[in-house]
Amino acid sequence: MEEFVIPVFSERDIPYSLLNHYPLAIQIDVKVDDEGGKHNLIKIPESDMIDVPRLSIIEALNYRPKRNDGVVVPRLLDITLRAYDNRKSAKNAKGVEFMTDTKWMKWAIDDKMDIQPLKVTLDNHCSVNHQLFNCIVKARSANADTIYYDYYPLENGAKRCNHTNLDLLRSLTTTEMFHILQGAAYALKTTYELVAHSERENMSESYQVGTQRWIQLRKGTKIGYRGQPYERFISSLVQVIIKGKIPDEIRTEIAELNRIKDEWKNAAYDRTEIRALELCKILSAIGRKMLDVQEEPKDEMALSTRFQFKLDEKFIRTDQEHVNIFKVGGSATDDGRFYALIAIAGTDTQQGRVWRTNPYPCLRGALIAAECELGDVYFTLRQTYKWSLRPEYGQRERPLEDNKYVFARLNLFDTNLAVGDEIIHWRYEVYQPKETTHDDGYICVSQKGDDELLCEVDEDRYKEMFDRMIQGGWDQERFKLHNILTEPNLLTIDFEKDAYLGARSELVFPPYYDKWINSPMFNARLKIARGEIATWKADDPWSNRAVHGYIKTSAESLEYALGPYYDLRLQLFGDTLSLGQRQSAVFEHMAQQDDFSTLTDYTKGRTVCPHSGGTFYTFRKVALIILSNYERLDPSLHEGREHETYMHPAVNDVFRRHVLEMKDFSQLICFVFDYIFEKHVQLRNAKEARRIIYLIQNTSGAYRLDVLREAFPNFLKHVMNLRDVKRICDLNVINFFPLLFLVQDNISYWHRQWSIPMILFDQVIRLIPVEVGAYANRFGLKSFFNFIRFHPGDSKKRQDADDTHKEFGSICFEYYTTTKISQGEIDVPVVTSKLDTLKLHVASLCAGLADSLVYTLPVAHPKKSIVLIIVGDDKLEPQIRSEQIVNKYYYSRRHISGVVSICVNQGGQLKVHSMGITRHRICDKSILKYKCKVVLVRMPGHVFGNDELMTKLLNV
């Protein structure tokens, strides 16, 4: 058979029962009406297409597909054809058989981050219905196994869009490299009502017990976020009473809790009225809303289950603590007892005091909910309900129950504070580049200015850790950078815990308040001081909310190593699905940068596309920064050029032409090693680079060394030198390892608080623990980039290594040849299904969407090949769509012998294009009294394969 017939019909003109014997049919009387000439993307959730929800883009990127009629990997056939081509013959008892490289095929399938969760229907004729905006494509079930959707966000000429390589956008979003950074701030808790109780003239006076004194305020004055009452309070001149208050953000959730509380009270405190799972969900919602509404989802299952058990336990009337709480009289109330029991359950789950910065939303939600009723929770538990932290939870936190903690961490992206409201916020100043020579290099020098504090490595603590290192090797679970730093320790200080109202109602600030903390090892100095809100809350995250605050683009954020001092927000906002919406102003800010036009196809000042402007600029800028810093870590000497000067850190423009060709992070990683160690300037293709990085990360021991030997033989020679370090330059190679193990768009760390060893090129060279995913869950490049900026000069590199340096080499060789830190489990349904989500969102920011469906037809004779049948809308010309889809067959393009591209407009009219061995005609067909159109596809001299040929190809 060399002809293939595709009916194009309307049920009004001909029943499908007369056409259901055809493998493929196009029904044109079911469509989604366009709005203003664009597809109405808002209709996708109610249509039988793919499972993309009608949520904000950030919620959608964390969405777990719910309706699962099957999933499809669009490039599965491309992968299996390549595996078929590369089969090798092997002899066995049955003779010669061809063996498929199943390991490669599994990797290639798993590596594809474009899985489509389908929403399809099966009709009474055993056909699978795939809906497009302009029609429905009906396929017989035997022919449906390779059908997939192809969505393409249309390009806006005014923006000079280029929507190729949207995979790169997905990579940036999953590696925290498409995010805006904004400084951290604190303000008075919105769950507290602070009421003035007395005043004093100055801080040397004490508040008089039993009497009230008024100087500038009146009795009952409430302390807000500005004005004289706030000024007097922040100056520690007002004694206050703390009452609970319900903030507007969580009023609905607190109402739900109060409903449960009232039912519990009315049922005589019957535990069956307490549904722990329901409580836990409400408390989690509170915890998210009050800290970061767009917080990355965490795996709370184990902790949440433990919390639910504790809730059940505390609400049993025979529980001893339940009995004690109900024995207390005085100012105790049943409402207070309800929230006290929740707070105690949360404390027992945490096995210690719960703070607002607790990483688990359900626990911090328990604290916040209790604050709304009790005021300062632990102070009230002790004073009113006679409950204290258990001794087994440690003695350090029990004295804190005498204090009242009135400040809470703010997320400036989310806070509703008004312009002019007072806050306390961090200022974060990164060091400026400085001039140096090849002989001197750029090392960490601990120094501070007048009136500055200093955070550096504590020699005694470091020596203690080093002794443990010598005895037991690298302990990735217990070695922590924060354990070896001096005070004020930038990795442990927390203003929320360090500022409080003391036992005498005096406002106590920490010693570091309003002082610069200098930390050369983090290339920065920081200060927390008073400030105020500068702008109103906006949907667009590119809004510097604080006077003298800081906000940075993703390309600038690499320099900010200390995660607790800022928040991140994806620089996409708004709805996932929309007919049209505005994009973030951050892209216009990028377009104003001096290097924007050299890294993109734009001239300065034009309106830019978030992808061809934002994605490409961000990736290329970051790539230049990474390459330029790693170039300085080259172990080689600069013979004859020792006294040449250069600025550091600074971008080396020699890498620009290579960066412009890169399409994937893996190419960047491989190029670092190829350029510095292998002396190659040729860029590896993205598929090869991704495979190399995968193999390095997922092998260990001798197998990992074999991969390195094949991919980067000269680098391996330097690695082998770690077993017997001779000179300081031999240590440089250690700081290249994190690039191989910590950066990829589809990996997860085994644990987000484990530490890897890196060299800190200080005046004394040290091996320090760098926690992956630590410092507020920063991961990827941000977790280690700060430390690769330091590099020894030639004078240091020539020095002989001492016994300590030799130990560094041995420890790191053992660790990095065996570590499996990058082999954690990813959340496959969430992570792998987001490429189409991003495509649909980009479509709403640019010129709308073009949609199509791809069907594969096998050819059996005279030469085995495939023909692609594409059915789509008229937003793209059929020949352009053909070229776009064929180009996605990276491995097996030579097997595509023909393409037929059918375009259907909103009125059901057709436009068809064929290429290769295929020819087409549009004909009229009559069956009895019914009529329809058919697209007659001919392949002169060729024979189509049977239905199961595709099944065989997909199971090579």
From Swiss-Prot:
Q: Where in the cell is it found?
A: Virion
Give the record's GO biological process terms.
Answer: clathrin-dependent endocytosis of virus by host cell; virion attachment to host cell
**Any keyword Membrane?**
no
Q: Which Pfam families match?
A: Orbi_VP2
Q: Which domain of life is it from?
A: Viruses
Q: Which cellular component appears as one GO term in the record?
A: viral inner capsid
Give the main location: virion
Keywords from the named record: Capsid protein, Clathrin-mediated endocytosis of virus by host, Host-virus interaction, Inner capsid protein, Viral attachment to host cell, Viral penetration into host cytoplasm, Virion, Virus endocytosis by host, Virus entry into host cell
- What is a single molecular function from GO for this protein? structural molecule activity
Output the InterPro entries linked to this UniProt entry: Capsid_VP2_Orbivir (IPR001742)
Q: Its function?
A: The VP2 protein is one of the two proteins (with VP5) which constitute the virus particle outer capsid. It is the major target of the host immunogenic response. Responsible for viral attachment to target host cell, probably by binding to sialic acid. This attachment induces virion internalization predominantly through clathrin-dependent endocytosis.
Protein family according to the UniProt entry: Belongs to the orbivirus VP2 family.
| Protein name, as recorded | Outer capsid protein VP2
Species in which this protein is naturally found: Bluetongue virus 10 (isolate USA) (BTV 10)
